């Protein structure tokens, strides 16, 4: 059943009614809510989901939704508001999973500093072998994790009812089981919007072939910095390869976004990133690319406290320098979303109060990673 578009004053999110997030720890309504120890075929009738839906239908904001509330207050948008837009502001009261966020495995060739063991087997290995790093992450029982085989089978068997399939990882382009799933969709020309989040390090020609053959394949490229800075923030990056793939996708993909996680590590690397993304947006515009007059979208996730990599978790000296850098960013040729985000980050950093404990936690984390990986994160602040 579909009701009228919900009023702005209502707290409504469509995801608990149409979406399932699946990773190695369970199933959830979205990536920001607690995982439940059920399989996909049990999810739609689970007591947890039913209670969550009832709270939303009564116009109440569930406590697990506070992250979106904070994002909306600070930056004017969130996963919830993006999802409302994606579903054309419809208000559902029944449950039919037509959108699966499928995070099949933590196999990944990168070890990004803002990531965690559940999404990178390399980080899982570091956490298991280092007592300092173990304090920052939930340590996994094994280095490599994958979602239950029953969930994989459910996804394959229910492709007919799925309208959108989001595939992340880990790095999906390095997972044979993901390639098999996408091959079926592409070669059978199924009517599914396939959204793959990638670090753009792929070398298998299949992904270029799929991009050419299947117009409903959407790429989200994770870019948090460019050049040598990218190789620190997103360890494992070979920038020349990533840049080549991003430029190729910008001209050949039917749909591509760039996603940036903003932390206290890359807050002073945003200007060169924004400049590079502007080039990619130019290359992706029609007729050179396939993204109309505006080019591909650049979206952001801004890290918040109490996370130790929160964008405003800076020493006083670095806070002052970050403010100057962000002001410089605002002089660049930015699109509306970029400008809004930079204004929001600038306001957040300007209003931040120094937290010595949280800052020290960030220092210890990054210094230990420098030692393990032979890097120097302080160069990110030069």
Per-range role (PLM):
Residues 97-107, 116-149, 160-176, 188-206, ...:
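Core AdoMet radical
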Residues 264-280:
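Catalytic cores of alpha/beta
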Residues 177-183, 205-211, 269-273:
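Distinct, well-ordered alpha-helical segments
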Residues 209-216, 250, 278-281:
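Acidic (Asp/Glu)-rich catalytic clusters
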Residues 64, 72, 107-111, 116-119:
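Short pre-active-site segment immediately N-terminal to redox-active cysteine/selenocysteine motifs
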Residues 75-99, 108-110:
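Recognition helices and adjacent regulatory flanks at domain boundaries
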Residues 2-84, 302-382:
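Accessory C-terminal segments flanking Radical SAM cores
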């Amino acid at each position: 059943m579909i009701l009228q578009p919900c009023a702005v004053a209502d707290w409504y999110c469509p995801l608990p009614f149409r979406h399932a997030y699946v990773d190695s720890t369970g199933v959830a309504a979205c990536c920001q809510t607690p995982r439940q120890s059920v399989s996909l075929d049990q999810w739609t009738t689970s007591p947890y989901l039913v209670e969550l839906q009832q709270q939303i239908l009564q116009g109440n904001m569930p406590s697990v939704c506070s992250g979106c509330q904070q994002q909306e207050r600070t930056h004017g948008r969130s996963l919830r508001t993006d999802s409302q837009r994606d579903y054309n502001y419809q208000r559902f009261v029944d449950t039919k999973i037509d959108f699966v966020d499928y995070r099949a495995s933590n196999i990944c060739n990168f070890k990004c500093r803002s990531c965690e063991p559940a999404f990178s087997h390399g980080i899982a290995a570091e956490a298991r072998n280092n007592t300092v790093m173990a304090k920052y992450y939930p340590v996994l029982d094994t280095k490599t994790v994958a979602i239950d085989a029953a969930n994989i089978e459910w996804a394959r068997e229910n492709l007919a009812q799925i309208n959108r399939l989001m595939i992340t990882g880990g790095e999906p382009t390095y997972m044979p089981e993901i390639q098999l799933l996408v091959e079926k969709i592409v070669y059978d020309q199924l009517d599914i919007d396939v959204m793959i989040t990638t670090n753009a390090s792929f070398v298998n020609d299949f992904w270029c072939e799929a991009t050419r053959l299947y117009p409903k394949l959407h790429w989200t490229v994770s870019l948090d910095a460019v050049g040598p800075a990218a190789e620190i923030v997103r360890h494992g990056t070979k920038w020349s390869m990533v840049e080549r793939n991003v430029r190729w996708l910008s001209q050949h993909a039917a749909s591509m976004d760039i996603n940036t996680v903003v932390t206290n590590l890359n807050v002073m690397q945003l200007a060169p990133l924004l400049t590079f993304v502007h080039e990619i947006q130019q290359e992706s515009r029609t007729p050179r690319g396939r993204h109309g007059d505006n080019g591909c979208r650049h979206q952001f996730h801004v890290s918040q406290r109490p996370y130790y990599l929160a964008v405003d978790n800076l020493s006083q000296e670095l806070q002052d320098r970050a403010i100057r850098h962000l002001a410089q960013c605002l002089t660049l040729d930015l699109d509306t979303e970029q400008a809004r985000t930079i204004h929001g980050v600038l306001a957040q950093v300007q209003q931040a109060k120094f937290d010595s404990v949280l800052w020290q936690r960030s220092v210890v984390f990054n210094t230990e990673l420098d030692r393990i990986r032979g890097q120097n994160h302080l160069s990110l602040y030069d």
